[in-house]
Curated annotation (Swiss-Prot):
Protein name (record): Large ribosomal subunit protein bL35
Gene3D superfamilies tied to this protein: 4.10.410.60
Underlying gene: rpmI
NCBIfam families (alphabetical): rpmI_bact
Species whose genome carries this gene: Bacillus subtilis (strain 168)
Subunit structure: Part of the 50S ribosomal subunit.
A Pfam family matched in the record: Ribosomal_L35p
Source species, domain of life: Bacteria
Keyword tags: Ribonucleoprotein, Ribosomal protein
Regions that span the bilayer: none
PANTHER family assigned: 54S RIBOSOMAL PROTEIN BL35M, LARGE RIBOSOMAL SUBUNIT PROTEIN BL35M
MF (Gene Ontology): structural constituent of ribosome
Length: 66
């Protein structure tokens, strides 16, 4: 059986925390900031944790990430 390969696109987007959760960044942060409120832009700066429903799928893509 061949080795599982890490999905490189996912590896660049997710980081594992010390407790084993996955950190992610928010979408909608690349352009068109004039249309967004200051509050929305401030909230988008913070990182978020991957939801439980997506965790299993993403963990499988990140097979070899420690």
């Amino acid at each position: 059986m061949p080795k599982m390969k890490t999905h490189r696109g996912s590896a660049k987007r997710f980081k594992k925390t010390g407790s084993g959760k996955l950190k992610r960044s928010h979408a909608y942060t690349s352009h068109l900031f004039a249309n967004k409120s200051q509050k929305q832009k401030r909230k988008l700066r913070k990182s978020a944790v991957v939801s439980a429903g997506d965790f299993k799928r993403i963990k499988q893509m990140l097979a070899n990430i420690k």
